[in-house]
Amino acid sequence: MEAAEGSENYDGIQVLLSREVIDTAPQCPHGPTLLFVKVSQGKEQGRRFYACSACRDRKDCHFFQWEDEKVSQARLAAREEYNKSHQPPMTHAEYARSFQEFTALPLAKRKFCCDCQQLLLQTNWETHSRHRVLGDISLSQLKRPSQLLHPLENKKANAQYLFADRSCTFLLDTIIALGFRRVLCVGTPRLHELIKLRACKGTTPPIKSLLLDIDFRYSQFYSEEEFSHYNMFNHHFFGGEAAKLVCQKFLQEEDGNGALLVTDPPFGGLVEPLAFSFKRLREMWKDSNPENANNLPIFWMFPYFFESRILQCFPDFAMLDYQVDYDNHALYKHGKTGRKQSPVRIFTDLPLDKIVLPASEGYRFCSVCERFVCSENKHCDICNRCTSKDGRSWKHCSQCKKCVKPSWSHCSACNHCALPGHPCGTAGDGCFLCGGKGHKRRGCPHLSVSADGERMKRNLKQRSIKGNMKKQPTATTSKKKKRKRNNPC
């Protein structure tokens, strides 16, 4: 068994990744599950278990199975039936035929159900008569499905934050300037839309794009050559081998030349499974020319504080200063300053000096670092580089021998820089509660002696309060219990 390539041993839950594990893993509605294990002091603790690759909360996907658990044939059959029942109601080919019928309708008969997020043919009107329905859907609206569809906003599953037009335009202009002519859009529907819109207008060199996304709703708007239902956390094509071949053919056109992978994963997702999937996509690209020493170039959008994790998986990557903005995120928007700026950056293996950041948005070229940086990112002569990560001017600490955030100061007790007023001695690899080594807070003996007694008292008190309320069970709660019993996972 191999751990994620480049992953470090750390306390907590760790994912174990290999091609063999994913190919033989049990499946949930989101494809092959991932194998996890609890790790303490770099060593496995307890039994390994399978859980959903896409959802971090068991409320969103109930799947759980011990690695060594014996599963009956009846349970396997029930699980397979359950997985099938949670797939899209139509195949991609059926959606494509429906879309052709829809576009042939006159404007007055083109309707979209806002509640079901579905394009409606006349045969569906009666079924959706009590729903919120949008009429007169124009052809231009059909070319911008990300503006028609409600973004998925579950932060622990498939949260969709869509590029603002400013960032999307910058990305496409940069892609064109770098000479790429085919873009594999993994979780970037806005970029896919813009590429297709510009291709229709003929205002830019011809660029092709293929969208891979876990949101099957895009099947309503794009053909099988334009979109594949895909889970980037386990490299699973829901359309099977046919969809995988479409992607492989797209990557291998012109012997793989001129192709670029652009991805914008959910920020709460594990870095290691994502990197594993991107490496699998690189392998698909390389099959066209196995002797090619190069790799499929990547633009990976992710918060800057994941830099170390990404560099563990891709040591040849570097982070751009460009701040990626989103339309439907309260904080990640252009124009904010200081710590409220968007923390999302672009990680890439392309030469940084070739990527020009717009001066109109406050970026400048550092001749020493040979790359474009944020205007507030001052060059440190001691570190010999522009050191800021968050858009503010950082300061050099001679004792730490590195630049730190402007709000930090050196703590002689901790022997490193931190926020003023921080609790000394709680940082590090030991226990947060007592500061001891060899265990974490959950396994602290002091917690079991003192805190557990108080917690038990609180629980008993809460139970007595609930008992006194004499609340009658509602229909909704009984339904929830029934659903839980019927779940085969």
Swiss-Prot record:
Renumbered zinc finger spans (GRF-type): 28-70
Pfam family, one: Zn_ribbon_GRF
Span of zinc fingers (CCHC-type): 429-446
Ligand binding (Zn(2+) 5): C397, C400, H410, C417
Positions of Zn(2+) 4 binding: C380, C383, H396, C403
Biological process annotations from GO: positive regulation of translation; rRNA methylation
Subcellular location per the Swiss-Prot or TrEMBL entry: Cytoplasm; Nucleus, Nucleolus
UniProt domain comment: The regulatory loop blocks the catalytic center by bridging the methyltransferase domain and the C-terminal CCHC-type zinc finger, resulting in an autoinhibitory conformation.
Protein known as: rRNA N(6)-adenosine-methyltransferase ZCCHC4
Gene behind this protein: zcchc4
